[in-house]
Amino acid sequence: MAQVAIITASDSGIGKECALLLAQQGFDIGITWHSDEEGAKDTACEVVSHGVRAEIVQLDLGKLPEGAQALEKLIQRLGRIDVLVNNAGAMTKAPFLDMAFDEWRKIFTVDVDGAFLCSQIAARQMVKQGQGGRIINITSVHEHTPLPDASAYTAAKHALGGLTKAMALELVRHKILVNAVAPGAIATPMNGMDDSDVKPDAEPSIPLRRFGATHEIASLVAWLCSEGANYTTGQSLIVDGGFMLANPQFNPE
């Protein structure tokens, strides 16, 4: 039986690119979508073109714990799970003094509670299978540094980074490796961009002077799912074009 990778929110952007790269590595792919079913179907068609299997399910992490049960159905359809990529997320911006509690909770529900439940479902199945596995949490560069006027998003990504480390320590005995990938400014639909926006000098405030492409995140995820990453767990790997190196003294030329 082929190995199985499930990528949440793989109807577009980083999630879709992860699905395609893992399909190229021979994984059968589980695809989840929240509001873009057509995008999920498009991802599935491209996955199948690589000679592997694709299954689709709607996943609503805004309604928990019931919403996460869709992941169990997807695992049942595919027969197993070897990789989970927690890519689904939500964000909102508002000054801290104006942040409404219900908006705060919406972000934490999806970004933290949803990742916790999906990881727990996946890890329990991996333990049952007895062959280890990989869990990759897509966090953000703002797991490490705050995003102005986005206290909920910043706090949620910090929490997901902490969860990554806690899971890594507890699950290593089951040969389940857990890591985070922390993207910087990536050209995704969530950011109102696509790959056409990845061009030289488009963003001089970033030392590499451009936005990142989705494949530059997905390629790291794919490596974390490979044998080359067998000694890597509990890490948060930043992919940000040098953003974290730029301080107020950084002077783009």
For each of these PLM feature ranges, what is it?
Residues D11-G13:
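Conserved glycine-rich cofactor-binding loop
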Residues P95-F96, E103-F108, A202:
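Substrate-binding pocket helix/loop in short-chain dehydrogenase/reductase
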Residues S119, A156, T164:
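Active-site helix of classical SDR
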Residues R124, L169-E170, N230:
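Alpha-helical segment proximal to the catalytic Tyr-Lys
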Residues S140:
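Residue(s) in the substrate-gating loop at a strand-loop-helix junction
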Residues T145, T233-E253:
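Short C-terminal tail/terminal secondary-structure segment
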Residues V172, L177, T232-G234:
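Short, small/polar-rich loop/turn modules that mediate ligand/substrate recognition or access, typified
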